[in-house]
Amino acid sequence: MLKRIISARYIRNMSSGASLVEKAKKSAAYQAVDENFPEGAKVVGVGSGSTVIYVAERISQLKNKESFVCVPTGFQSKQLIIDAGLRLGTIEQYPEVDIAFDGADEVDTELNLIKGGGACLFQEKLVAAAASKFVIVADFRKRSPSKLGIQWRKGVPIEIVPCAYAKVSKDLEAMGAKKVELRQGGSAKAGPVVTDNNNFLIDADFGEIEDPAKLHTDIKQLVGVVETGLFVQMAYKTYFGEESGEVKCWSK
């Protein structure tokens, strides 16, 4: 059973010029840090995304910030850590993480996640797996009313070895994917997106996902797949910034 907690106590003292959604995202991030940051933490994972910017901001305000290191999940989060004046570490140096904070593209009612819209899914999952507690911060648009694949309609992000993209694409179609696309760089880059690990990304649309654990396992068995953006039963809590300006927390 999920516990739902509504709070508006972090809304006060914010710039009136900010949009209500941005205020709520900031409130969610601040509340997530304040309620979950472990006393005596030595290693903290910091993810990426627009809401995690506020997580880094709040962590930088802690009086004991010199006593712990922050491990990034990719280039963007590395820059967040540096810009916030926090001590930077790596997952190679610190394979055990006390707590990790990250965003999500979608969260279902069982706290399963779709991540990878920002192309950092492998390192995000590595840090999440290393963490004793994994806390998600997002806005209300990322919350599914039931299953994954309802709010996030771009498909499951899948990181693959570049030379395997054609074979993996065919295999995903055979598994029932309605649409399979090799993610492109768009106007910023000609050709496919290249991850921080020098891999490609495929987005595979399976519609509403009935069993994310099985789908993750089936995809991982395909030769050439590095990791999927399905984070199954990894999150400890999720904080949502609501359109109303309140914060809603889902926990196990």
Swiss-Prot record:
<protein>
    <recommendedName>
        <fullName>Ribose-5-phosphate isomerase</fullName>
        <ecNumber>5.3.1.6</ecNumber>
    </recommendedName>
</protein>
<comment type="similarity">
    <text>Belongs to the ribose 5-phosphate isomerase family.</text>
</comment>
<dbReference type="InterPro" id="IPR004788">
    <property type="entry name" value="Ribose5P_isomerase_type_A"/>
</dbReference>
<dbReference type="Pfam" id="PF06026">
    <property type="entry name" value="Rib_5-P_isom_A"/>
</dbReference>
<dbReference type="GO" id="GO:0009052">
    <property type="term" value="P:pentose-phosphate shunt, non-oxidative branch"/>
</dbReference>
<dbReference type="GO" id="GO:0006014">
    <property type="term" value="P:D-ribose metabolic process"/>
</dbReference>
<dbReference type="GO" id="GO:0008615">
    <property type="term" value="P:pyridoxine biosynthetic process"/>
</dbReference>
<keyword id="KW-0413">Isomerase</keyword>
<dbReference type="GO" id="GO:0004751">
    <property type="term" value="F:ribose-5-phosphate isomerase activity"/>
</dbReference>
<comment type="pathway">
    <text>Carbohydrate degradation; pentose phosphate pathway; D-ribose 5-phosphate from D-ribulose 5-phosphate (non-oxidative stage): step 1/1.</text>
</comment>
<dbReference type="InterPro" id="IPR037171">
    <property type="entry name" value="NagB/RpiA_transferase-like"/>
</dbReference>
<keyword id="KW-0963">Cytoplasm</keyword>
<dbReference type="GO" id="GO:0005737">
    <property type="term" value="C:cytoplasm"/>
</dbReference>
